[in-house]
């Protein structure tokens, strides 16, 4: 197996819920990090990036669910670079880095950009399906924290 190396690291800014970053989209945060990494490493051409794997615990709403893909396009990477978003809640970013390492170790790629990005303030409100067409029993949930659409069986087992 190949040995993997982390050649550079940068992190997104850390904010507070409802704070200074509240109006910043998640894909824009991801693009900022990708663009900054590419600018700091001019010896790595954009075309050398074989994949972008980003973790995100709440990929729903305005960011189109695939934050990695949207972020890499916003950062100016070629449209031929694929993007994969990993959702393992709090361990999403670490899982993305581990997945990238595995892909390189197995020889499927040489250069992968991996990490994580999140903005919990931007988590959307979500509405449940109704029990029948045009029903009036929809429920609304804040998707920022906690369970959203709780499966009653899981609630009975662990709730």
Region roles according to the model:
Residues 48-55:
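Short glycine-rich phosphate-binding loop at a beta-alpha junction
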Residues 3-4, 51:
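A residue-level signal for beta-strand positions that form part of recognition/binding surfaces
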Residues 10-14:
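Short polar catalytic/cofactor-binding loops
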Residues 1-2, 16-46, 61-65, 72-159:
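Acyl-thioester C-C bond-transforming condensing/cleaving domain
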């Amino acid at each position: 197996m190949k040995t993997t190396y982390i050649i550079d690291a940068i992190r997104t800014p850390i904010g507070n819920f409802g704070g200074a970053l509240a109006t910043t989209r998640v894909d824009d945060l991801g693009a900022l990090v990708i663009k900054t990494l590419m600018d700091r490493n001019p010896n790595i051409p954009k075309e050398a990036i074989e994949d972008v794997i980003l973790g995100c615990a709440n990929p729903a709403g305005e960011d189109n669910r695939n934050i990695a893909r949207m972020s890499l396009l916003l950062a100016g990477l070629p449209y031929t670079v694929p993007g994969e978003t990993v959702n393992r809640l709090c361990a999403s970013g670490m899982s993305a880095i581990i997945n990238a390492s595995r892909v390189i170790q197995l020889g499927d790629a040489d250069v992968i950009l991996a990490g994580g990005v999140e903005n919990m303030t931007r988590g959307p409100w979500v509405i449940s399906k109704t029990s029948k067409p045009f029903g009036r029993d929809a429920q609304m949930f804040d998707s920022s924290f906690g369970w959203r659409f709780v499966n009653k069986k899981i609630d009975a087992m662990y709730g």
